[in-house]
C-alpha cells in the first residue's frame, strides 16, 4: 500500500489460466484506479498491430497463369486456393524469407501438412484444408514466406506500380500478425481498506506460432521501449517537426453508391449493413462471399473498383465509424 501521493501500487501477476495451447487468460492486480483501462488498451493495440510474424506473400501453381484460372481434378478454383493459403499459420526458425513447395497427386484432401517444410519451417495448423483433389487430379505449388508485421495488401508491398514480378508467381495480401484475438476486462480489486482499485484480465488467442504468454511479454517490451524515451526526456538540440495524426481519408466517408457498382452488388452490400466505403474495406473476401446473392463475379467487381482507388478488402481502421457518421 502506498504511503504518499508519489508512490503507486505495482501490479503483480496473480493468475495465468492456460485455456488451450493457443489461448491464455492473464490476471494482474492491484492497479491504481484507471490504470487497468490505460494498460489494457495499450497492450491490446500493440498485440494486434506490432507482434511480428510470417505469412505467404506469393504463390506459384503449375498450370496457372492468373488467379481466375481453374485446375482439372481440383474442386476449388485458384481464388479459393489462394484464400485457403492465407490461413496457413507458419514460421521460420532461422530465416526471414523462404520458399516452400507442395506436391500432391493422390485423391483426397490437400492440407497445410502436405508442405515440404524442410528443417527450418514449422506449420502450426497442419490440418488446415487447402484444396480437394478428385481422381486424377494433382496440385503442385510453391509459396514464398516472408516475415513482417500487421496486414499488408499487395499494393503496399510493391515499391513501384510497375515493379518487376517473378514470372508465374501470384502476389497475395498478407496478414503477418500471429495474434487471432485479444480482449481485456477490468474488474474491481481491493487492498486493505481501498476498494477503488483495478484488476486487469488479458485474454489472448494466437494462431499457434507464438504462445499467448510470450506474446504479452513481447508487447510489454515494445511498450517499454517506446516509453523509455519519455523517462529520460531532455531538451532537444533542435526543433523536431511533429506531424499531426492523420485524419480519416475522405474517400472512406463516401457511400458505397459512389463506387458505381452494379445494382445487384450495391443491394447485396446494403443488405449486409455496408453503407460506406470505410465499412466495405474492413470486410474480408470470405465474409462477403457468405452474403446472400453475392457471388464471385460481384466480389471481383468490388475488388477491381477498390483497387482503382488504391484500396483493398481486409483493411483495418482504428476508431471506425467516426463520430457523427450516419447511415445513408
UniProtKB/Swiss-Prot annotation:
Superkingdom is Bacteria
Q: Which UniProt keywords apply?
A: DNA-directed RNA polymerase, Nucleotidyltransferase, Transcription, Transferase
Disulphide bridges: none
Q: Which GO terms describe its biological process?
A: DNA-templated transcription
| Descriptive protein name | DNA-directed RNA polymerase subunit alpha
Task: Outline the subunit composition.
Answer: Homodimer. The RNAP catalytic core consists of 2 alpha, 1 beta, 1 beta' and 1 omega subunit. When a sigma factor is associated with the core the holoenzyme is formed, which can initiate transcription.
UniProt similarity note:
Belongs to the RNA polymerase alpha chain family.
> Region Alpha C-terminal domain (alpha-CTD): which residues?
248-328
Which catalytic reaction applies to this protein? RNA(n) + a ribonucleoside 5'-triphosphate = RNA(n+1) + diphosphate
Q: Which InterPro entries match?
A: DNA-dir_RNA_pol_insert, DNA-dir_RNA_pol_RpoA/D/Rpb3, DNA-dir_RpoA, RBP11-like, RNAP_asu_C, RNApol_insert_sf
Report the leader peptide range.
none
Q: Which GO terms describe its molecular function?
A: DNA binding; DNA-directed RNA polymerase activity; protein dimerization activity
Organism of origin is Methylobacillus flagellatus (strain ATCC 51484 / DSM 6875 / VKM B-1610 / KT)
What's written under domain? The N-terminal domain is essential for RNAP assembly and basal transcription, whereas the C-terminal domain is involved in interaction with transcriptional regulators and with upstream promoter elements.
Where are its TM segments located?
A: none
Known EC number: 2.7.7.6
Q: According to the UniProt record, where is the region Alpha N-terminal domain (alpha-NTD)? A: 1-234
Amino acid at each position: 500500500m502506498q504511503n504518499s501521493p508519489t508512490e503507486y501500487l505495482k501490479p503483480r501477476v496473480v493468475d495465468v489460466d492456460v485455456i488451450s495451447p493457443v489461448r491464455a487468460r492473464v490476471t494482474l492486480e492491484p492497479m491504481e484506479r484507471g490504470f487497468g483501462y490505460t494498460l489494457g488498451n495499450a497492450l491490446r493495440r500493440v498485440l494486434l498491430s506490432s507482434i511480428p510474424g510470417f505469412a505467404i506473400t506469393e504463390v506459384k501453381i503449375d498450370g496457372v497463369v492468373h488467379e481466375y484460372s481453374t485446375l482439372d481434378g481440383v474442386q476449388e478454383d485458384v481464388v479459393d486456393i489462394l484464400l485457403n493459403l492465407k490461413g496457413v499459420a507458419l514460421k521460420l526458425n532461422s530465416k526471414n524469407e523462404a520458399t516452400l513447395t507442395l506436391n500432391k497427386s493422390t485423391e483426397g484432401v490437400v492440407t497445410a501438412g502436405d508442405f515440404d517444410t524442410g528443417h527450418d519451417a514449422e506449420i502450426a495448423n497442419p490440418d488446415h484444408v487447402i484444396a480437394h483433389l478428385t481422381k486424377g487430379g494433382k496440385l503442385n505449388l510453391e509459396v514464398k514466406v516472408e516475415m513482417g508485421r500487421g496486414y499488408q495488401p499487395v499494393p503496399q508491398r510493391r515499391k513501384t506500380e510497375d515493379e518487376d514480378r517473378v514470372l508465374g508467381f501470384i502476389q497475395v495480401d498478407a496478414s503477418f500478425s500471429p495474434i487471432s484475438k485479444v480482449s481485456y476486462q477490468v474488474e474491481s480489486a481491493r487492498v486493505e481498506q481501498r476498494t477503488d482499485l483495478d484488476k486487469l484480465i488479458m485474454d489472448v488467442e494466437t494462431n499457434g506460432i507464438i504462445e499467448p504468454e510470450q506474446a504479452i511479454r513481447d508487447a510489454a517490451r515494445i511498450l517499454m521501449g517506446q516509453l523509455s524515451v519519455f523517462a529520460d526526456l531532455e531538451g532537444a538540440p533542435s526543433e523536431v517537426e511533429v506531424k499531426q495524426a492523420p485524419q480519416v481519408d475522405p474517400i472512406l466517408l463516401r457511400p458505397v453508391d459512389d463506387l458505381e457498382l452494379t445494382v445487384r452488388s450495391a443491394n447485396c452490400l446494403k443488405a449486409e449493413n455496408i453503407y460506406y466505403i470505410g465499412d466495405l474495406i474492413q470486410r474480408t473476401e470470405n465474409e462477403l462471399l457468405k452474403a446472400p446473392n453475392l457471388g464471385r463475379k460481384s466480389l471481383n467487381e468490388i475488388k477491381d473498383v477498390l483497387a482503382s482507388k488504391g484500396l483493398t478488402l481486409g483493411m483495418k481502421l482504428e476508431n471506425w465509424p467516426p463520430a457523427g457518421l450516419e447511415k445513408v
